[in-house]
A protein has these predicted regions:
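N-terminal helix-turn-helix DNA-binding core of bacterial DNA-binding proteins
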Residues: 18-60, 81-90
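Short, hydrophobic-biased segments on the C-terminal half of alpha helices
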Residues: 65-66
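Short beta-strand "wing" residues that participate in macromolecule-binding interfaces
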Residues: 76
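Amphipathic alpha-helical dimerization/coiled-coil segments
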Residues: 1-20, 34-37, 93-115
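Glycine-centered, phosphate/nucleic-acid-interacting loop/turn motifs that mediate DNA/RNA or nucleotide
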Residues: 72
Length: 115
């Protein structure tokens, strides 16, 4: 069996586990959690800064940032610095609350597993 065939069931199990434990499925993904975490400790970050911090591709970061924006967890402002396009993100109050809930839930799960 090829490695990608083994990975699909693992991803499906992870999604089912997130749903079963009540974790916020919007946040429960590596890049989206990284975006929210970075924005929680920075007032604002540009697309290029986030891309570098998260080691993400342009397309990957765009898709995940859009998903967070649709959920109301971040805002996105597009503009220009001189003639260069610039995209800047900020976490919203709802995003900060959702991240806090998510982290509390994860801490409780970890505590339960550790006993």
């Amino acid at each position: 069996m090829e490695s990608h065939e083994k990975e699909a069931p693992r991803v499906a199990r992870s999604r089912r586990a997130a749903a079963a434990t009540g974790l916020d499925r919007v946040i429960h993904e590596r890049v989206r959690l990284g975006i929210l975490s970075a924005l929680a400790v920075n007032d604002r970050l540009g697309f290029t800064e986030l891309k570098g911090l998260l080691d993400a591709t342009d397309g990957n970061l765009s898709v995940h940032a859009r998903r967070l924006e649709e959920a109301g967890y971040i805002t996105c402002e597009k503009g220009y610095e001189g003639r260069v396009p610039h995209t800047e993100y900020r976490i919203t109050r709802d995003g900060r609350r959702a991240l806090d809930r998510y982290l509390s839930h994860m801490e409780a799960l970890i505590g339960a597993v550790k006993g």
